Design a protein with these regions (language model features):
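C-terminal outer-membrane beta-barrel translocator/porin domains of Gram-negative envelope proteins
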Residues: 1-113, 118-121, 125-127, 171, ...
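A short pocket-lining beta-strand/turn micro-motif at the edge of beta-sheets
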Residues: 91, 111-115, 138-144, 150-156, ...
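Short basic/hydrophobic patches in alpha-helices and adjacent helix-turn junctions
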Residues: 96-100, 144-149
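Short proline/glycine-enriched turn/loop segments at secondary-structure junctions
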Residues: 105, 132-135, 166-171
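Outer-membrane beta-barrel transmembrane domain signature
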Residues: 118-143, 149
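Predominantly the C-terminal beta-signal and adjacent terminal strand-loop region
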Residues: 150-185
Length: 185
């Protein structure tokens, strides 16, 4: 669990209310934000792991886009483009069940192969919504995926997600495949 308090002080130049209002007419340079995240992971059966995650942001201010809580993407709400939506405050939840390592069923091809099922969601809120925009947009998806490695240095992640609740550019029923690769030297 982590929680942090962030305060922005007006220092002039580009860090001024005048500059901030060029992107958001209700924004002020003198704002504060509370951000928190928590995660829990538990082995529920031999080889099976359940993981829950929560991220949150709270403020009473109308923020510029770079300070807003963003949702959508491979490490947020799968099934959506990266940061498909952002707002002044919000929460993101994820629940993922990872199965046992089944790599031995494929000979020596994989060092590790585990399948996952997941549900992701986010709720956001604008403190001063712009005319025509949703006051409290929300995203939700579910899906399946795999975590595999050919060696300890090369890790792959593949997730296929279906949108349950979306935004106009990615509505209910939309499907997206996320693929990531990580390597270490």
């Amino acid at each position: 669990f982590q929680i942090g308090y962030f305060k922005n002080y007006v220092t002039g130049g580009n860090n001024s209310t005048t500059q901030y209002r060029m992107t958001n007419p209700a924004a002020e340079a003198n704002f504060d934000v509370i951000r928190a995240n928590a995660s829990w992971s538990e082995q529920v059966m031999p080889g099976w792991r359940l993981t829950a995650q929560l991220d949150a942001q709270h403020t009473d201010y109308s923020l510029i886009p770079g300070e807003q809580f963003g949702a959508g993407g491979v490490y947020s709400v799968r099934g959506f483009e990266e940061r498909v939506i952002s707002a002044d405050r919000g929460t993101r939840q994820s629940l993922e069940l990872m199965g046992p390592n089944v790599s031995k069923n494929f000979g020596t091809l994989f060092e590790r192969l585990q399948f996952v099922g997941f549900v992701d969601a986010a709720q956001l809120k604008f403190n001063n919504p712009v005319f025509g925009s949703p006051v409290e947009p929300h995203l939700m998806s579910y899906g399946v995926g795999a975590r595999f490695a050919f060696s300890p240095k090369h890790q792959f992640r593949v997730d296929l997600a279906k949108v349950v609740s979306g935004v106009p550019i990615q509505p209910h029923g939309d499907v997206m495949l996320h693929v990531t690769f990580a390597t270490s030297l």
